[in-house]
Amino acid sequence: MVTGKMMGCHNVKQVLLINVYGEDKPGVTNAVAEVLSRFEVTVLDIGQAVIHDQLNMGILVAVPEEGSVSEIKSEVLAVLQTLDMQGRFLVVPDESYQDWVGQQGKARHIVTLLARSIDASHLNAVTKVTADQGLNIDKIVRLSGRVPLEGTEQMGQACVEFSVRGNPKSAEALRSSLLELAGQHNIDVAYQEDTIFRRSRQLVVFDMDSTLIDAEVIDELAIEAGVGEEVAAITEAAMRGEIDFTQSFTQRLALLEGLNAEVLQTVADRLRLNEGAEYLIYSLKQLGYTTAIVSGGFTFFGQRLQTILGVDYVYANELEIVNGIVTGKVTGDIIDGQRKADLLRELAHQQGLSLDQVIAVGDGANDLPMISIAGLGIAFRAKPVVKASAKQSISNVGLDGILYLLGYSDKDINKLH
């Protein structure tokens, strides 16, 4: 028997869990609440889910000493029968209840599964990893919208969010397992702590080349200069982290010497935004986020994107042009990986934000310094070495998949558009 005060309720005789299920209809919760109100029970917990018009609701109540569990069961069942609903009842032992109360201080994490479409093998793979790591799933929510049966293979993207309780046996092994299964199943799986900052982040910093746009600008300029293959090979090695970024950038830049500056506009005209970029940034702006481009590319292209997308800040390299000709140099310091991290810190300070309130998104090894210090660092369609080092990665859906990592549903975001 549970005795004494419990959350301000009367002396308690028993704790009762009531489970109501059946076809959803208006008035079910009210009908059950009306019965319970006559017995002066205290509501300790309540929750419900509706899947394809099937309701499953749970109410945990403390029954006072003068109350009767059998009478409550009888009257609740009677009202449910009139609604063509069913009910189950469980008297919760004192020890079990106290254990439940004690769980409230335990760590909680969010596991987000993203894919073009989600099948049972994806759920099996993800939930096996969480179970093996001793994590208990408290809640599962579909964040993506409803889809028709026809054409599910061609739909945009799907997302399911798991709220899990506890700490993994090995955080490193968990992340490694999730990264491995993501590659095997062509899905993305994010794992992050469920903190107050998750939906209160306010600054998003993007890399530009191969992140917001689908190309490396310096490679495109090199094609115009007739040194495309040579520059592309250096770019690939730099993005994989095999060559120091500043060294590789200087080498590639020198090969552009003599290029007519009019070519910059030609290249800009053929650049394309990566999937989901415009939708993501519009949504972020509507939600009040500050956005910035911090790029090892060039200001000419960054400022063009700023105009198209409405980005708040742009930091990139200033290509030196003399008499309409590219000199093969930049003016000022080169924005390398460390400078990216420094600029992220400066932006956060200007906005009065902690680093926990900052999101960083990039694809290359030179993005890792800023990705690693941001509260939410995301490798987008990145090289394997970058994905392995970043806490989160997205490779199989568009940039707008980031909204799911922030906890927003399609229903939430569609209201903004």
Q: Which residue stretches match the model-derived regions?
A:
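A conserved regulatory-domain signal marking ACT and ACT-like small-molecule sensing domains
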Residues: 2, 6-201
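Conserved active-site and cofactor/substrate-binding residues in soluble primary-metabolism enzymes
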Residues: 23, 27, 54, 67, ...
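Short glycine/serine/threonine-rich phosphate/pyrophosphate-binding segments
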Residues: 28, 122-124, 212-215, 367-370
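Solvent-exposed alpha-helical segments within well-ordered globular domains of core cellular machineries
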Residues: 30, 34, 44, 74, ...
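Long, charged amphipathic helices and adjacent flexible linkers at domain junctions
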Residues: 95-104, 191-202, 235-264, 325, ...
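Active-site neighborhood of HAD-like aspartate-dependent phosphohydrolases
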Residues: 196-246
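C-terminal cap/substrate-recognition subdomain and adjoining C-terminal extension
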Residues: 258-376, 380-417
